[in-house]
């Protein structure tokens, strides 16, 4: 496959097939494309408009060369989203993952350091004391023994290194932002997947279906949050039993009060860690409430509860009982829970 021909095809506004995209991204991850060529491809795809078939093909290439974590996928959940909302909230999906684990989900939390916000999942977990150099076997043991483990993206997606430079220099969202959440190294088939733009709700659900996911909630808040929002409505595209449906929810649907986005924002990793721990210690307020929403959705996506409303009830209970705090301590290796 000649690089020039692929770029000419994209410049002409012609979509790549799933197989063509898989071949292109496999070549990129093998180091066969130069940084300039990778940058041209990413910009060309963005300008043309990125299609589901292209996203699926690229993700298949990424999955083919990732370092896997071998665990049972029963009720195995991820809460990794696209990121890129640039709203600098505390780590809602990470805290929600811990609460979901305390509520009975098995969690393979996939994540990375922050690109545009104040604190990514890896940033806050590392600040809390979690090692980022855990082997796949150690991560698998954490999932099986504790019920939650963290999969640090660079440790499992080494082939992505060839695209790091072009992505940083372009400094725009690209297909890679969408591929990452669809490439859980443990193969988690259950997911709450936040997206940075409403237009990606259905395409991401369609891609997840093509890639074999079981139950996925693709979510986007009207305030731009790539989580279920507390400041107003959130849209959801749900993949379940092979079917995709759309819905809109509000905090009041679950007995919670709306609150301004500013109540969830932080300005440093230290502030993000403090926010996470105050929620896990069940301190009332908007931060706890937004976690109740997202953890409730996570428990539903994991098929631990019959609907999101019950999930919110369970999330509230594990925070109140201290089970969520205990799960956090176990994840960090401070207790021997198992």
UniProtKB/Swiss-Prot annotation:
Q: Which residues bind Mg(2+) 1?
A: 93, 227
Swiss-Prot/TrEMBL keywords: Amino-acid biosynthesis, Aromatic amino acid biosynthesis, Glycosyltransferase, Magnesium, Metal-binding, Transferase, Tryptophan biosynthesis
Where, by residue number, does 5-phospho-alpha-D-ribose 1-diphosphate bind?
81, 84-85, 89, 91-94, 109-117, 121
Gene Ontology molecular function, alphabetical:
anthranilate phosphoribosyltransferase activity; magnesium ion binding
Cofactor(s) in the UniProt record: Mg(2+)
Q: Where, by residue number, does Mg(2+) 2 bind?
A: 226-227
- Describe which pathway this protein belongs to, using the record's wording: Amino-acid biosynthesis; L-tryptophan biosynthesis; L-tryptophan from chorismate: step 2/5
Write down the EC number: 2.4.2.18
Where on this chain does anthranilate 2 bind? 167
Q: Which InterPro entries match?
A: Anthranilate_Pribosyl_Tfrase, Glycosyl_Trfase_fam3, Glycosyl_Trfase_fam3_N_dom, Glycosyl_Trfase_fam3_N_dom_sf, Nuc_phospho_transferase
Tell me the function of this protein. Catalyzes the transfer of the phosphoribosyl group of 5-phosphorylribose-1-pyrophosphate (PRPP) to anthranilate to yield N-(5'-phosphoribosyl)-anthranilate (PRA).
Q: Which family does it belong to?
A: Belongs to the anthranilate phosphoribosyltransferase family.
Oligomeric and partner information: Homodimer.
Name the chain's protein.
Answer: Anthranilate phosphoribosyltransferase
Q: Which species is this UniProt entry from?
A: Acidithiobacillus ferrooxidans (strain ATCC 23270 / DSM 14882 / CIP 104768 / NCIMB 8455)
- Show the taxonomic lineage: Bacteria, Pseudomonadati, Pseudomonadota, Acidithiobacillia, Acidithiobacillales
């Amino acid at each position: 496959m000649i690089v020039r021909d692929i770029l000419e095809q994209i410049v002409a506004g012609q979509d790549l097939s799933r197989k063509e995209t898989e071949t292109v991204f496999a070549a990129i991850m093998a180091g066969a494309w130069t940084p300039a060529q990778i940058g041209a491809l990413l910009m060309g795809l963005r300008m043309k408009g990125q299609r589901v078939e292209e996203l699926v093909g690229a993700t298949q290439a990424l999955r083919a060369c990732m370092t896997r974590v071998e665990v049972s996928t029963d009720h195995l959940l991820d809460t990794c989203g696209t990121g890129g909302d640039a709203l600098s909230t505390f780590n809602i999906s990470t805290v929600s993952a811990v609460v979901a684990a305390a509520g009975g989900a098995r969690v393979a939390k996939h994540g990375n350091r922050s690109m545009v916000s104040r604190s990514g999942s890896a940033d806050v977990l590392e600040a809390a004391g979690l090692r980022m150099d855990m082997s796949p076997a150690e991560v698998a043991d954490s999932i099986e023994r504790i019920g939650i483990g963290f999969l640090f993206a660079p440790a499992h997606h080494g082939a992505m290194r060839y695209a790091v430079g072009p992505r940083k220099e372009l400094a725009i969202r690209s297909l890679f932002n969408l591929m990452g959440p669809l490439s859980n190294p443990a193969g988690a088939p259950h997911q709450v997947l936040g997206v940075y733009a409403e237009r990606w709700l259905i395409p991401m659900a369609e891609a997840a279906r093509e890639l074999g996911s079981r139950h996925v909630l693709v979510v986007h808040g009207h305030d731009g949050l790539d989580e279920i929002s507390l400041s107003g409505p959130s849209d959801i595209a749900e993949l379940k039993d092979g079917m995709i449906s759309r819905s809109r929810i509000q905090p009041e649907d679950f007995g919670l009060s709306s609150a301004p986005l500013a109540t969830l924002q932080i300005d440093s990793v230290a502030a993000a860690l403090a926010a996470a721990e105050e929620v896990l210690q069940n301190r009332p307020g908007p931060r706890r409430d937004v976690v109740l929403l997202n953890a409730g959705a996570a428990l539903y996506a994991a098929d631990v509860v019959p609907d999101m409303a019950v999930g919110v009830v369970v999330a509230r209970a594990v925070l109140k009982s201290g089970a969520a705090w205990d799960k956090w301590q176990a994840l960090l290796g401070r207790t021997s829970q198992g």
